[in-house]
Regions:
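Beta-strand-rich binding/interaction modules
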Residues: 221-222, 538-603
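Glycine/proline-rich low-complexity spacer/linker segments in large multi-domain proteins
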Residues: 94-105, 154-208, 228-229, 606-620
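Hydrophobic helix-coil surface modules that form long, contiguous segments used
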Residues: 185, 200-380, 409
Length: 620
C-alpha cells in the first residue's frame, strides 16, 4: 500500500541518513528488503540442484565433467535466458584480468561438448566467451517454475596453481570447475560482473551431489559429506577415518608409508568418490596420490555435543602441516564459542596444501610456511570465512568488506587468545593497517562502500581488509561486547542462507541495538575519512583537567590517552567512539582528577594514526 511504502522510505531521511543506491531504493519499494534490517516480506532468492561428475586422471591435465542442473526461479520475473559463470575461462589468453598472466597460467579455457535445455540438445555457441556467458532459453522460465539443464565439458588444468590448478604432476586442486548459473537477485538482477582474477565471488545456495572419478591410489578431499567411504577406502583406513570423528586426538589416516604401499584405496582402475551437501554456495576438491591424510575432530556445539571433523592433506615434507589439525581444532573452538560465537555450521573442515591462501565451503587451500605461527594465522583466517561469505551469502565481488573485513576481525580476536595481545596487535598492524595508513594517495581514501569491481590496486585490498575490520572493532568498542554480540547474532540469524547487502547489516545493528548508528556508518563506510587524531589542548578548569581532541581524519575511533602527572604517575583513559557522535571533528575528555598534568599522549594501538606529530601535548 502507498502509506507503508512512504513511511518506510521516509524513515532514513533524517540527519546523516545513509546513501541508498537506486536499485536498493527500488527493493525497499518492492518490499523485498526492509530498512529495519530484516528481509522484506516479499524477499526471494533463486536456487538450484547440481548433480556433478568430474573426472581427473593425472598426470593427464584434461579435466572432464558432466552435470545436470535443475534451476528454480523463485523470483516474480519471467526469465528469457540465464547467465552462466565459466570462471575457468579466466585462464584464456585475451580475457580481461587484473594483473599479468604467465605462460603456465594460460589455457584454452572451458570447452562445452554438449548442452541440453529441458532434454533438448542445443549448440552452446560461446567458444570465444569469457567468464560470463548468456544463453537464451528455449522457453521462458516463468516465476516459481524450473528448468532442467545439462552440460558436458572439459578444460585443461593450469600448470600454475593459485586458487586452483596443478600443485604437482599428481596433485590437483579443482575449484570453479563447473558451469553454474549466476546469481539473479532482488536488487541487481543478474550478477553480470566478469571475473577478473582479483575479486572474489557471489553464489546462490544450492544442493550438490559431486562424484569424483580418479585412478586407484588417489585420495580425494572435497566439500560435503563423503557418502561412499567403504567403496573407496580399504577397511583399515576406513576404520581410521571413522575413529577420527569421535576423538580429539590426531589420527594419521594415511601416512607416507601407507601411501608408498599403494593399498590405501580400493584397487579398481578408477574409483568414484561421492560427496553431497545441501544448501551450500559452492564445492571444491583436492586430489593426490602422495599427500598424507591427518584427521581429528572437535566439539563445535557445547549444547548438543556435536563434533566437526578436522582434516589436513599435505606433502609430508611440510612441517607446519603436521600441526594443522591442531590449528583447525583451535580455530573452530574459538569461532564456535567466542567470536562470532556461532557453532561451526558444517560437519567438517579440510585444509589442503596448495599455493593460494583461499577459502571454499569446508575447504581451504593454503601454502606451507616455515613460520608455524604464520601458518596458523593464515589457516584461521580462511576457516573464519565459513561465516562470511559461506553462512551468509555475501556478494564478495561488490562488497568484499562484508567477508574479508569480518575474517580479518576474527583473525585478530583469535590471535589475541593464542599469542600475547601485543604480538597479535603487531601482526594486525603489519598485515592489515600500516600499508593503508602510511600511504596518503587518493585511492586509499575511497569510501569502503565503493563497489569492489570499480576499484583496483591498493585501494581495493585496504577497503576489503583493514579498514572495515577497524570499523567492526570500533563499533564493538562503541556498543560493548554484549550488545555487539547480540547485534551480530541477530544479523546472522536474519540473513543466514540469504544475500545480505551492507545496508541490511547497518540497519540490523541499528534496530537490534536500539540506537541510530547512521552517524557511525556514514563516517566509516560512506566517507573519504581516515585516522588522524590530535591533542589540541590540555586545560585546567578550576582544578578539573580537560583534554581537547581534534579528529582531523574523520573516522570515529576509540580513544586511549596516556596521562602523565607532574608527580610522575601515569594513567590510561579510554573513551569509546561515542565521543564523536555529537561533533565528529572535536571532542573533550574530562580526566576526573585534580592532580597536575604534565603531558597527554594519544595511544593508538591498532588504530594507527596518519600523523603522530600532533599526538602529544606538553602542559606549559
Amino acid at each position: 500500500m502507498f502509506l507503508p511504502v512512504f513511511v518506510m522510505i521516509a524513515l532514513p531521511l533524517t540527519a546523516q541518513q545513509l546513501y541508498w543506491p537506486r536499485d536498493l531504493r527500488q527493493a525497499y519499494q518492492n518490499q523485498t528488503r526492509s530498512n529495519d534490517g530484516w528481509p522484506g516480506k516479499k524477499y526471494w532468492q533463486n536456487t538450484g540442484r547440481y548433480d556433478i561428475t568430474v573426472t581427473a586422471l593425472p598426470p593427464d591435465r584434461t579435466i572432464r565433467g558432466t552435470e545436470q542442473i535443475t534451476y528454480i526461479n523463485n523470483s516474480p520475473d519471467t526469465l528469457f535466458g540465464l547467465v552462466f559463470n565459466f570462471i575457468q575461462n579466466i585462464h584464456k589468453p585475451g580475457v580481461t584480468r587484473l594483473g599479468d598472466a604467465s605462460p603456465d597460467y594460460l589455457t584454452d579455457g572451458v570447452h562445452v561438448d554438449r548442452y541440453t535445455d529441458n532434454g533438448t540438445e542445443e549448440q552452446w555457441g560461446h567458444e570465444d566467451g569469457g567468464t560470463l556467458q548468456f544463453k537464451r532459453l528455449s522457453e521462458p522460465l516463468l516465476p516459481h517454475d524450473s528448468v532442467r539443464l545439462s552440460f558436458e565439458w572439459h578444460y585443461e588444468i593450469s600448470l600454475k596453481s593459485g586458487r586452483e590448478g596443478m600443485i604437482d604432476s599428481t596433485t590437483y586442486y579443482l575449484a570453479y570447475f563447473y558451469p553454474r548459473v549466476a546469481v539473479y537477485d532482488d536488487v541487481a538482477g543478474w550478477d553480470d560482473i566478469e571475473h577478473n582474477d582479483a575479486l572474489e565471488f557471489y553464489n546462490d545456495f544450492n544442493n550438490y551431489t559431486l562424484q569424483v572419478k580418479v585412478p586407484r591410489n588417489y585420495l580425494v578431499w572435497a566439500t560435503g559429506n563423503l557418502l561412499n567411504a567403504p567403496e573407496v577406502l580399504q577397511p583399515k583406513y576406513l576404520q581410521r577415518l571413522q575413529a577420527s570423528g569421535k576423538t580429539g586426538q590426531l589420527v594419521h589416516i594415511a601416512d607416507s608409508a601407507d601411501l608408498a604401499g599403494r593399498q590405501v584405496t580400493a584397487q579398481q582402475d578408477v574409483n568414484t568418490w561421492k560427496f553431497a551437501y545441501d544448501d551450500i554456495s559452492d564445492v571444491a576438491l583436492g586430489l593426490s596420490d602422495h599427500y598424507v591424510w591427518d584427521a581429528s575432530s572437535v566439539v563445535v556445539d557445547a549444547s548438543t555435543g556435536r563434533r566437526a571433523s578436522v582434516q589436513a592433506a599435505y606433502n609430508d615434507t611440510a612441517m607446519d602441516y603436521h600441526h594443522m589439525t591442531d590449528y583447525e581444532q583451535s580455530a573452530l573452538t574459538f569461532l564456535s564459542g567466542q567470536w562470532p560465537g556461532v557453532p561451526y555450521p558444517f560437519p567438517k573442515m579440510t585444509v589442503f596444501q596448495g599455493y593460494a591462501g583461499m577459502e571454499y565451503p569446508m575447504m581451504a587451500n593454503d601454502e606451507t610456511y616455515q613460520n608455524f605461527e604464520f601458518s596458523r594465522f593464515v589457516a584461521e583466517h580462511e576457516i573464519s570465512h565459513t561465516y562470511f561469505p559461506f553462512y551468509m551469502g555475501i556478494d564478495e565481488t561488490r562488497y568484499g568488506f562484508m567477508d574479508e573485513g569480518w575474517a580479518t576481525t576474527f583473525e585478530l580476536l583469535y590471535n589475541r587468545t593464542v599469542m600475547s595481545r601485543d604480538s597479535a596487535d603487531d601482526f594486525y598492524r603489519q598485515f592489515r593497517v600500516n600499508n593503508w595508513i602510511e600511504d596518503n594517495s587518493a585511492e586509499e581514501d575511497l569510501p569502503i562502500i565503493t563497489p569492489g569491481d570499480d576499484i583496483g590496486g591498493r585501494g581495493l585490498g585496504n577497503n576489503e581488509y583493514g579498514k572495515p575490520s577497524l570499523a567492526y572493532l570500533s563499533v564493538k568498542d562503541l556498543l560493548g561486547d554484549d550488545l555487539f554480540r547480540k547485534c551480530l547474532h541477530g544479523f546472522m540469524e536474519r540473513w543466514h542462507g540469504k544475500h545480505p547487502l551492507p545496508w541490511d547489516f547497518f540497519y540490523s545493528f541499528n534496530s537490534i541495538s536500539g540506537k541510530n548508528l547512521d552517524w557511525f556508518w556514514n563516517a566509516w563506510f560512506f566517507s573519504h575519512d581516515y585516522i588522524d587524531l590530535a591533542v589540541s589542548n590540555v586545560q585546567n578548569r578550576g582544578g578539573d583537567w580537560e583534554v581537547h581532541l581534534d579528529n582531523i581524519g574523520g573516522f570515529p575511533v576509540p580513544v586511549d590517552l596516556l596521562v602523565t602527572y607532574t608527580d610522575g604517575s601515569t594513567v590510561t583513559v579510554h573513551r569509546t567512539p561515542a565521543i564523536w557522535e555529537q561533533d565528529p571533528a572535536r571532542a573533550s575528555i574530562a580526566l576526573g582528577s585534580k592532580k597536575s598534568v604534565r603531558s597527554v599522549t594519544l595511544v593508538h594501538g591498532i588504530y594507527v594514526d596518519a600523523d603522530a606529530a600532533n599526538d602529544t601535548f606538553e602542559v606549559k
